[in-house]
From Swiss-Prot:
One of its GO terms (molecular function) is metal ion binding. One of its GO terms (biological process) is heme biosynthetic process. SUPFAM superfamilies: Chelatase. Fe cation binds at residues 218, 299. HAMAP family: Ferrochelatase (MF_00323). It comes from the Bacteria. This is Ferrochelatase.
Length: 371
């Protein structure tokens, strides 16, 4: 293995600390070519698809990519942002806004911490962002995947990629990991405020007449639960804590799982059939919120807000409400700061005064020291 050269060391340079927010990823454009490139990277990850490579790769390249790329590109086109202040993939736009807002809040709190964001698949890549942090002299990095509920298919593969990048560095930084925050009070509070704020503006469901709040999480193959992946249990706990915070009874809200892929059994109940059944039995209003997605993306804006609404109404339902994800809501940015600071304890979060830095450089140079 070849190890990359390190940036030149500067005497007296203070150790810098960074928070790296990591999300799943997105294509660079809503085109079949860009979507195909993204899907290839995503679905080639053995953490995501646990099928022997010799069996899976011919299926991926021969069947899935040629047909799914074009269909998925049309879906991305339907939700692509083209506003003056927000252009591009919603997932990337909102993740970047989260990083920027968290950076400002940390500065306001007196913490000199760099906040960056990266994608596990696509751009900006984990490797490119970590290399940029290295050039800035970063010596402590907190990896904070934006997956509230841990799964080997999401959080673990983000960690894998960061470890792979570091395996080529000569001078490695200190590293800390946020495994999950599915039951963190700041996260639950942000979810509570997001739903409560929506209801304050658009009215609250009439639970007495049978209206329902659906909490839709991304699904996983059922066999992963049997193999020990904790994701399902953590989703249920998040749902229970949010329901309690909202003061709801068990029958007034329901946890479901979306985005099933393939024919194998996934975590149930499935979101789409649940919405269709609610419409069929005459439910007048359904609100859908996706607590496992801190930023709106194709799974929320297209699969739920568009397809889910259609499922419900075609089956006879009337009033469908999609509650936006946390995105860059003030309560969520404050929650992110709370989560990050809990894991940053003991690391330097303040840069010394310039006079002190100059004094350090002078002392180091006078002694001929290398640090």
């Amino acid at each position: 293995m070849t190890f990359s050269p390190e940036p030149a060391h500067q005497h007296g340079q203070p150790p810098r600390t960074a928070i790296l927010l990591i999300n799943l990823g997105t294509p660079d454009a809503p085109t079949p070519k860009a979507v195909g490139r993204y899907l290839k990277a995503f679905l080639s990850d053995p953490r995501v698809v646990e099928i022997p490579r010799l069996a899976w790769l011919p299926i991926l390249h021969g069947l899935i990519l040629p047909f799914r790329s074009r269909a998925s590109a049309m879906k991305y086109e339907s939700i692509w942002l083209r506003e003056a202040h927000m252009t591009g993939s919603p997932l990337l736009v909102y993740t970047e806004r989260q990083a920027h807002a968290l950076q400002l809040l940390m500065q306001q709190q007196g913490h000199d911490v760099t906040v960056a964001c990266a994608m596990r698949y696509g751009n900006p890549s984990i490797e490119s962002v970590m290399e940029a942090l290295r050039r800035q002299g970063t010596e402590q990095i907190l990896l904070l995947p934006l997956y509230p509920q841990f799964s080997g298919t999401t959080t673990a593969t983000a960690f894998d990629e960061a470890f792979r990048v570091l395996s080529t560095w000569r001078n490695q930084p200190e590293l800390r990991l946020v495994k999950h925050f599915h039951d963190h009070p700041a996260y639950i509070s942000a979810l509570h405020k997001q739903v409560g704020g929506y209801w304050a503006q658009h009215g609250k469901p009439d639970f007495a007449r049978g209206d329902k709040l659906i909490l839709s999480f991304h699904g996983l193959p059922r066999r992963l639960l049997d193999l020990g992946d904790p994701y399902h249990c953590e989703c249920l706990k998040t749902g229970r804590l949010l329901g309690e915070a909202l003061g709801l009874q068990p029958g007034q809200f329901q946890v479901t799982f979306q985005s099933r892929f393939g024919k194998a059994e996934w975590l149930q109940p499935y979101t789409a059939p649940t919405l269709a059944e609610l419409g069929k039995v005459g439910t007048q209003r359904v609100d859908v919120f996706c607590p496992g997605f801190p930023a709106d993306c194709i799974e929320t804006l297209e699969e739920i807000a568009m397809e889910g609404q259609s499922e419900f109404r075609l089956a006879g339902g009337q009033d469908f409400h999609f509650i936006p994800c946390l995105n860059d809501a003030e309560a969520w940015i404050a929650g992110l700061a709370d989560i990050a600071l809990q894991h940053l304890q003991g690391w330097p979060l303040n840069v010394p005064h310039p006079h002190e830095l100059e004094a350090r450089r002078s002392r180091a140079q006078a002694r001929g020291a290398g640090a």
